[in-house]
A protein has these predicted regions:
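ATP/NTP-dependent adenylation/nucleotidyl-transfer catalytic domains that generate, transfer
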Residues: 1-168
Length: 168
């Protein structure tokens, strides 16, 4: 699982969470998708573009837990990854209060309605609060930026807690 999925517990226990190392556990999904598109077209000197990534990049992310006919897509289950990652960074790294975070979302994501932004934020808070127990069990991962969700070293949150609320 990547950091975006870890934040909201979008993983199967002893499936995604099994093992001693989570190579992409410290990387958010939005960054990972941009990096894969870059690797498809450019990639580092000497390696050249990896054209086979076209087949990966053409697909919408999906956990594939439901029958294929259901059309399950991660962003339909959760929210757009760009918004999820913006909420995660503002909440975890910047320690923003719910009202300030909602104001930030309003300014940054003008294509979305007030109701959509409130729903995304409420969903994030609900999933974050419900899934600390999963974050406690994830394997260690590489961290490429200035924060992580590792409860043993950076982001401690109580397993038993009330859900965070957005002011009316």
């Amino acid at each position: 699982s990547n950091r975006s999925e870890i934040a909201v517990g979008y993983a199967t226990m002893d499936g995604d969470t099994a093992g001693g190392l989570a190579p992409i556990g410290g990387i958010d999904k939005h960054f990972l998708r941009k990096w894969l598109r870059w690797a498809e077209h450019e990639c580092p000197l000497g390696l050249g573009p990896i054209s086979a990534l076209k087949f990966v990049n053409e697909q919408e992310p999906t956990a594939e837990l439901r029958p294929a006919a259901s059309g399950q897509k991660d962003e339909l289950d959760l929210m757009p990854y760009e918004i999820l990652n913006a909420i995660e960074a503002a909440f975890v790294r910047d320690r923003m209060e719910p009202e300030s975070l909602l104001n930030t979302l309003r300014e940054r994501f003008t294509a979305y309605s007030e109701k959509q932004l409130r729903d995304f934020l409420a969903r994030f808070y609900r999933l974050w609060s419900q899934n600390q127990w999963k974050r406690e069990r994830y394997a260690s991962g590489f961290h490429l930026d200035d924060y992580n969700l590792d409860p043993t070293s950076w982001c401690r949150y109580p397993i038993l807690s009330v859900e965070l609320k957005i002011p009316d």
